[in-house]
């Protein structure tokens, strides 16, 4: 559902502060840009048909065998690859999805004819899709609970794209490769704040990685994405802010929003969170912020299970966060009608 995602900055003429994307927007990528200028000549040649050199680096960094790693063009390609692979392997197959969550799990299943269940019960040849930390709620499922799911379902896909934005315990790559039915998705896009390069990877037991390779086309990951991540990982580059400071600021922003009559911001374990506005809609608020304050938020009403009143916020700098709060206060004051939250 490509038109249903956030970060639709292209729809507006002059967005100056972007709260819509969960990717950190203030990363200093200047040294990476310098490196890419040095290797730009590589675009004259085809990339590796399968990026084995980067997979070897990832395997070494994560402490797993290289045949347990598969690099993809972002975590989204991994989602569709997994759905395609299992759809072609099994005649009777269904998926369970914990809503609200990232829409691509359901979209990928629909594309390949995998029925999705309305509840979370396991059945024959079942796969559970789990976003952890979850987008859009920011909640985290414990490793112990995931292991329980692995006993209940034939396969469990754990999308850890936002793992670098939480302090909660995560399922480790070692836990995954020692299982026989867990697939773990990682997003280098999120880790290094490079969404335009589209790169991620899967960690899974070697027999599952081997199966996925059979259904993956050649040259799906471009040269610059491969070279960027090789350089970033080999040089142990970190572009995200201090996580403790970042999450403290997230909580400050959430509390400030909760002081506005008509706004209710939910708890979170990461840098983004859901909020509700009543009696107005998220679409009204989004349009006002974009056109009057050059601020972009995520209208979350298209997440299954949410309402037209839900929106999502991703923490920015303290100054930018205060500008958002002031702009929302202004919107509510202009409307001058506030609900009573129960």
Give the positions of each predicted feature.
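N-terminal "arm"/small-domain region of PLP-dependent enzymes with the aminotransferase-like
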Residues: 1-45
């Amino acid at each position: 559902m490509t038109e249903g995602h956030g970060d639709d900055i292209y729809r507006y003429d002059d967005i100056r502060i972007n709260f819509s994307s969960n990717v950190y927007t203030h990363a200093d990528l200047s040294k990476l840009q310098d490196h890419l200028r040095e290797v730009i000549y590589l675009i004259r040649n085809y990339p590796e048909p399968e990026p084995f050199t980067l997979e070897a680096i990832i395997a070494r960094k994560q402490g797993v065998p290289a045949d347990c790693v598969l690099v993809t063009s972002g975590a989204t390609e991994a989602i569709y690859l997994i759905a395609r692979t299992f759809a072609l392997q099994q005649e009777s197959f269904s998926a369970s999805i914990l809503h609200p969550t990232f829409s691509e799990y359901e979209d990928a299943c629909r594309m390949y004819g995998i029925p999705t269940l309305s509840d979370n019960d396991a059945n024959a040849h079942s796969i559970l899709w789990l976003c952890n930390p979850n987008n859009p709620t920011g909640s985290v499922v414990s490793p112990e609970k995931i292991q329980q799911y692995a006993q209940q379902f034939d396969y469990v896909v754990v999308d850890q794209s936002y793992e670098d934005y939480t302090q909660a315990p995560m399922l480790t790559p070692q836990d995954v490769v020692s299982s026989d039915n867990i697939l773990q998705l990682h997003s280098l896009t999120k880790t290094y704040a490079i969404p335009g390069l589209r790169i991620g990877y899967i960690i899974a037991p070697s027999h599952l990685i081997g199966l996925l390779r059979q259904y993956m086309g050649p040259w799906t990951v471009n040269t610059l994405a491969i070279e960027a991540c090789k350089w970033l990982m080999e040089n142990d580059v970190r572009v995200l802010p201090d996580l403790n400071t970042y999450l403290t600021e997230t909580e400050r922003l959430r509390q400030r929003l909760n002081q506005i009559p008509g706004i209710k911001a939910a708890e979170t374990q990461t840098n983004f969170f859901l909020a509700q506005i009543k009696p107005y809609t998220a679409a009204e608020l989004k349009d006002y912020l974009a056109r009057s304050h050059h601020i972009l938020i995520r209208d979350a009403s298209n997440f299954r299970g949410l309402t037209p009143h839900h929106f999502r916020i991703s923490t920015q700098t303290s100054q930018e966060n205060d500008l958002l709060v002031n702009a929302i206060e202004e919107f509510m004051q202009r409307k001058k009608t506030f609900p009573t939250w129960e």
